[in-house]
């Protein structure tokens, strides 16, 4: 029987239930990948907080202009690069699982090239921030500061175009501890570098932008050194982990299949980018709406605290999502659908546990947490009221974030993009507007809109994951990256059916 007919045989596979030792072993593997990634995310969070604090030390104008620039660069640049880079996860992870390192290396290099191409229009947009903001009637002095920050941040696009793919490549190999150590060293150097450029040589806000680039450049340099040393060590024992000396091969021959990598990479990168941007932009949308509420200063201050809170809480779900994406893609590439299902099940269970801790933590610490950011009593009262709602959002956000990782690992990012659009803009946005402005709930209404979006997203995406046919996904992975392996269980079924036909 041919491969096209394999899908008819999948239902013959017996139901697989993992044993407790298998669950514990999978939990250890997910922990080993996710812990360094979570630590790296927290370190980057501290790096960003350091930059904001330094801008605050410069003055209120610099803080306002810097905040505007950071929001603009996140929306138009960093979210796009991050989203495009995640498109390499299914290709790279499944290629590594199927023992196809040349495809993984080629995917890495082409993703870097794709991000460099995307940086060109982003750079033009950043250079034209001033006329755009003035057209939107933003204050001239704030626009001037924001424009300076964006101009000096242009080199950071180059650094991120290499950093994002390299991090994903190493994570797909399960090599996450070097990522954490490289990030730790660069973040420890970030404070003295920022102090030197911002205050010692009096560059001001441009100094903050330059410092962020230098910190990322240091992290990139350390990662490249690690890869170089690892390749030298592997040269003496096994094959290289990354073929740095192979050409980029932007276009392959007609029969080589190299061009298929380009089309497949773009097919995954675009919906991955859309999925990331749709969720990322919703928080900016909520901030904009807060500015139109009856007490905009209070609402905007509370919105800033909420965004900082969600950013911090998001580190653990993001790490779990990255870990399960790696595990699912590796196991599907290796032709082990039952192991991929186990990884997905264990990760969702861990997500539920983490979300409960998030809800308890925000509820218990809702009053103390606000005091970290402000002493304004009105802002503190509003923050204490909405933080438990944000904690309730985490009950849905954590499982849906992990489920997005499962979809990425099984090469289905398009489904996540569609669900994010439906949940955040068809459900969440209208609910937020009606509750905040029509029913008069104010900023609390916006937070309830976020809760509605997260619930809709979680229910939809968990339904998709629950109904996943893992044997079918394994066959798809074989068609995508594998010429070496196929699911042994399905292969046995095919042989038995062929014998029956004779």
Curated annotation (Swiss-Prot):
Gene, per the UniProt record: DTX55
In Swiss-Prot or TrEMBL terms, this protein is called Protein DETOXIFICATION 55
This protein's record includes keyword Chaperone: no
Q: Which terms in the Gene Ontology molecular function aspect does this entry carry?
A: antiporter activity; xenobiotic transmembrane transporter activity
The entry's localization annotation reads:
Membrane
Among PANTHER family, the record links this protein to:
MULTIDRUG RESISTANCE PROTEIN (PTHR11206)
Gene Ontology annotations for the cellular component aspect, listed alphabetically = membrane
Q: Which residues cross the membrane?
A: 30-50, 61-81, 112-132, 145-165, 185-205, 207-227, 261-283, 298-318, 344-364, 378-398, 419-439, 447-467
What keywords would UniProt list here?
Membrane, Transmembrane, Transmembrane helix, Transport
